[in-house]
Amino acid sequence: MVGYKEKKPEILNKLKSGYPRFVRHQRINVLSKYWNRQKPEAPNETFFFSNPKDWDFAQNILKISEAEVEQQEKYLIVHIPGRSKDCAKLHKFFQHAGVGLSSRHAETILDSLGILSIGESVTPNLAAEDDIKSIISKAHGPQVSPEDVLLTISGANAFTSVFRAALIQAKQQQKKLWVRLGWLYLDTIEIMDLLVENQAQIIDLNHPDEFYKLEEIFNTYGQDIAGIVTEFPSNPLLHSCDLVKVRQLCDQHNALLIVDPTMASPKNAKVTTLSDVVINSLTKYANWEGDVMMGSVVFPTHSDKGMALKMTVSEMITCPFHKDMERMAEQIPYYDNFIDRTNQSQLEIVEYLNSHPKIKRVYWAYQQSTGKNYRNIAGDDKPGCVVSFEVKGSFTNFYNALGMLKSPSFGTEFSLCCPYVYLAHYKMVTSESGLKILNHAGLSTELLRLSVGLEEPEEIKESLDQALKLC
């Protein structure tokens, strides 16, 4: 894992697949090699956009100086000089903004070029989008209808599109202050920093011990506050703010409230009645078999501020490829059942971790520090599938010995574990200033994040137990 983060060739060459926003899929690599062969004279790196507007957005914000652009029938090709600063910037942009081609889209293109045939069998479904929206709207609560839901190519694309639209709204209102409440997911932090630049200021309240400052900030800055961005609960420490209080403060000062309940799912964390916009990564829970990237944006009809963004957001998002929607439509009928089962398994796993002598700390939705805030919204026994923890012994020995899939994702039928801080914030782990920020946020570099799958709880506990014996 460290070799991957340090981009050691001997590690990267063995990495055949990975989370699509971090590791380029083999189908996209094959397509890239095909187009590079058409231009052998130029040592370029090739990028693909399913939505040409995403290239316009990237060009505008990154100020890329050298690029050769080719418009194909249903996608855009951008050639950038390899190993250039522009190339590195665009790679980061793809990760943080959640754009590009899906592997199924690339495979369809390769099939049309006669390079390879489509190997996957997906049930054709002209109503796939409607099927997905129907189930996702119900998960958010009775106040949400399918018409209130937009589907996007990824969860990151959902947030990026909403925040872009919110910045336009804030500029019109002459508001220049945003608050990140709780430690947010890496790409949410990065895309906010990238988009804000010099036109706005961001205040970070990373730890629950700082949440009380939010009222002071509103009292001090009042009408200058454009909005609050929070996860409910947060990633990876599963902290939850007092969302009712935050809603009241936003209403008093006409501020936008953007909430992402992905960690526990919108089915568990019913945040819609308190939010102006709800972001959700359908890659988790809905895609419980782990082979589709997708996101959603929900606009609660009670929120005039949220509804005012809907048209702009709909023009900014990149819609999922039709085969990805068909694949998601095959899985999503089991969404409710998957969440119910993993809720119950999670309760057993948390009890096991809390009672184990080699476990130092456990972080989950109902933890003592902020659990009451989560319970006020979700009720009891709905923790979602994610729990984070620290071990008392050797973190390295435990992780290396753990007989479980290692992945940065969650919400799949197979249990997953990852050393979250190393994966998401490696630059911080390797710098003194970064370590100070992590420490202030209560994030141990040796934090482990576990996603509980559909295996029997005893099987999951056995895997953990064997590794804990060796740490």
Language model: regions and residue ranges:
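Conserved PLP-enzyme active-site core in the AAT-like
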Residues: 148-358
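Active-site C-terminal subdomain of aminotransferase-like
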Residues: 6, 19-22, 26, 277-429
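Conserved N-terminal alpha-helix of the aminotransferase class I/II PLP-enzyme fold
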Residues: 1-157, 165-168, 181-195, 201, ...
